[in-house]
Amino acid sequence: VRIEPLPERLYDAAVRLWQDSGLTRPWNDPEADLRRAVSGGSSCVLAAIGDDDGLLATAMVGHDGHRGWVYYLAVDIAQRNRGLGKQMMEACEDWVRSREIPKIQLMVRGTNRVTVGFYEHLGYADSEVVVLGRRLDDLSQIALAPSLPSARIRSTLRISDPAA
């Protein structure tokens, strides 16, 4: 297995892997995400490629000048539980470290306990921050979240539950 920047011939396979792994959402275009990552100077899509030149895993890594970020870490289902996810994260950390960025982070949906456990096992910890977002495209009408603040946001900001 070798880890290297994703070759163009495997772009479609990477998008399929992300879809098969449940990483895509209707409001995010994974093909556009991939194109932006590989064409930007501050990001890259890394690939684990097998001896048969097939795609085994991916991770999108980049930085904003202050923090490194990881997205789309996906391992082919037939390759899971063999240490490949850990190897991909180590490659992402090396990529970020080589750019003298002092911190790397990622986002995981709170309901995805298995994935949270994977990252905790690698030494990652909850940063105890609230991530807020706003759509700037035509997809802003998609209901991304309930209209009331989540329990976690209410707790963090010490806002009482309006339903109570």
Predicted regions and their residues:
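Acetyl-CoA-dependent GNAT
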Residues: P5-Y72, D76, M89-A91, W95, ...
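Short, charged, solvent-exposed linker or helix-capping segments at domain edges/interfaces
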Residues: Q141-P149
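Short secondary-structure transition/capping segments
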Residues: V38-S39, V116-F118, L139-Q141
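A short, internal acetyl-CoA/4′-phosphopantetheine-binding micro-motif in the GNAT/acyltransferase core
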Residues: L73-R80, V108-R109
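Extreme N-terminal starter segment of soluble prokaryotic enzymes
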Residues: V1-R2
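Conserved active-site alpha-helix within GNAT-family acetyltransferase domains
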Residues: N81-R82, K86-E90, S98, P102, ...
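N-terminal beta-strand motif that seeds the catalytic metal site of vicinal oxygen chelate
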Residues: V108, D137-S140
